[in-house]
Regions:
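Structured catalytic-domain cores with a bias toward divalent-metal coordination
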Residues: 1-220
């Protein structure tokens, strides 16, 4: 396992925010998993922490295929997690509505631009996320209808159902949409909790513990 900084936001009045990634294996960029983009996505961050633990054990046992790389980013919004606020910064920006961003914009735009530049070349992209409205959810996979979506692959998560959504203009600012626009097979995974941990749904959503066949390209 190799821990590296994906992007750093410098601050005058508080500690810098480092977006950290955990890389397993070397070679082709096979799969990238992104966790909490909003400050209340504790469940999503927890799933990524368990995923890092599992992948580290697999790597130590020589079970990561040669020439394959997996990257896990547990959170891209540690500032909001630390102060228990859903959105980012004084302008309350929704990170998952700020893609693809740009290098000369607001902090949220610079963050998403740097992140997408780092992760856009992966074959598979998985985002653990929450819906933009409050509600109760059965764990499921959701993706945008861009012409690049692949519901057959989404079914391999083994979750109860897959939702394909026709994007409206605001959806074009999401990570899922922009990942697909970069030709990454992107999947958004929803569980039934956000701000607290639910072990059962966390295990159900974990793509290594559960029979997600895409990982056969990365893991023996």
């Amino acid at each position: 396992m190799f821990e590296r900084d994906i992007y750093t936001i410098h601050s005058t009045y508080r500690e810098d925010m480092h977006i950290k990634g955990f890389q397993f294996g070397k070679g082709e960029k096979s799969a990238c998993i992104v966790g909490a983009a909003r400050g209340n996505e504790i469940q999503q961050m927890y799933i990524c922490s368990q995923l890092v633990k599992t992948l580290r054990e697999l790597e130590n046992n020589g079970c990561i295929s040669a020439g394959k790389q997996i990257l896990v980013i547990p959170t891209i919004n540690a500032y909001s997690v630390n102060i228990s606020r859903r959105f980012f910064g004084v302008k309350e920006a929704d990170i998952n509505r700020s893609f693809p961003g740009n290098d000369y914009g607001e902090p949220a735009d610079r963050l998403t631009n740097a992140l997408l530049t780092e992760i856009k070349d992966y074959v598979y992209g998985i985002q653990f996320t929450s819906f933009y409205r409050p509600g109760e959810f059965v764990p499921h996979v959701r993706m945008m209808e861009t012409g690049y979506q692949n519901t057959s692959l989404a079914n391999l998560f083994g979750l109860p159902y897959v939702v394909v959504r026709k994007p409206v203009p605001i959806d074009t600012k999401t990570l899922n949409y922009n990942w697909q626009d970069e030709m990454t097979a992107a999947f958004s995974v929803y569980t039934n909790q956000n701000s607290q941990i639910d072990e059962a749904s966390a295990r159900q959503a974990d793509p290594v513990r559960e029979p997600f066949r895409l990982y056969q390209s990365c893991i023996i």
